[in-house]
């Protein structure tokens, strides 16, 4: 968290008013009690509160993680998606309040945002294994479903997908953003 390159990236994010959230570690995925310490470390580097999160590997245990996120002051989580299938894990394209399984009551503070699409879901042989044209068609179809539902389009594109070794994912991302900006 203290490298010069990361500091430059954080400065760039700040200059463009990007919101930075906590990427809950694999370790905290096994031990939710680690979430507050990870959040505090990120806040110390940023010098500002962190209220958003997503779990590594989309790994989320209920209700332990939900309770830990709430206790840590996280208000918005973006983990609700499947790695092996694009679409709406929550059955909706709209953000929803977390429901506590034990009490069946709505969380007063934690909102779950459906993850619409993760790039490796499209391309990886162990998941959907789509070619570029099929991946673009699916991404645009999902974006259209989100638009019709007045939902929230959440895309997860890993930084490694912007490298020359990522197959079609870098160009897909650029094309998808351009088409979405044009109203596709």
PLM feature spans:
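Short loop/turn segments at strand-loop or loop-helix junctions that form parts
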Residues: 25, 113-118, 157-160
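Short acidic (Asp/Glu) and glycine-rich catalytic loops that position anionic groups and cofactors
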Residues: 18-20, 118-123, 156
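Alpha-helical structural signal in soluble globular domains
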Residues: 12, 16, 41-45, 68-74, ...
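Metal-dependent polysaccharide deacetylase catalytic core of the NodB/CE4 family, i.e.
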Residues: 1-60, 64, 159
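Active-site-adjacent pocket scaffolds in enzyme catalytic domains
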Residues: 43-146
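C-terminal domain-boundary segment and adjacent tail
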Residues: 13-15, 136-184
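Histidine/acidic-residue-rich catalytic or RNA/ligand-binding cores of hydrolases
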Residues: 31-37, 62-68, 88-93, 165-174
